């Protein structure tokens, strides 16, 4: 019986740790077509430098669409064809922050942008 209680307690602790993962996006705004924006994503609750990170977006009334990814040390990136040459993903592992520089913005880039682990 004592073992069972200990096991349940351990599971509760692990679930609590998992819930501490936070990804907080900032930097959005309204710009004219052709303008630029830089998005940031502040990460906490996990070892940021150990994970590949992604940006995805959701246009109004549409599903989630993958935009870009970067490997753990920032040496490798890839992009959806729709943003290639216009968007640049980067990261600062010392600051636990992911970035998306968006240039030459188009009407079709209008969306809610999310970072993802």
UniProtKB/Swiss-Prot annotation:
SMART domains: IGv
Chief location of this protein within or outside the cell: secreted
Annotated GO MF terms: antigen binding
Disulfide bonds: 41-115
Region described as Complementarity-determining-2: 70-77
GO biological process, one term: immunoglobulin mediated immune response
PROSITE patterns named in the record: IG_LIKE
Location of the Ig-like domain: 20-117
GO CC annotation terms, alphabetical: extracellular region; immunoglobulin complex; plasma membrane
Subunit structure: Immunoglobulins are composed of two identical heavy chains and two identical light chains; disulfide-linked.
Protein name per Swiss-Prot or TrEMBL: Immunoglobulin heavy variable 3-74
Annotated organism of origin: Homo sapiens (Human)
């Amino acid at each position: 019986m004592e073992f069972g209680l200990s096991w349940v307690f351990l599971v509760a602790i692990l679930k609590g740790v998992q819930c501490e993962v936070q990804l907080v996006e900032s930097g959005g705004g309204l710009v004219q077509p052709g303008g630029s924006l830089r998005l940031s994503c502040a990460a906490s609750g996990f070892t940021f430098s150990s994970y590949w990170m992604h940006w995805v977006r959701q246009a109004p009334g549409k599903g989630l669409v993958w935009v870009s990814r970067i490997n753990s040390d920032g040496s490798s990136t890839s992009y959806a064809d729709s943003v290639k040459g216009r968007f640049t993903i980067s990261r600062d592992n010392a600051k636990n922050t992911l970035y998306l520089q968006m240039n030459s913005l188009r009407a079709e880039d209008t969306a809610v942008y999310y970072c993802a682990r």
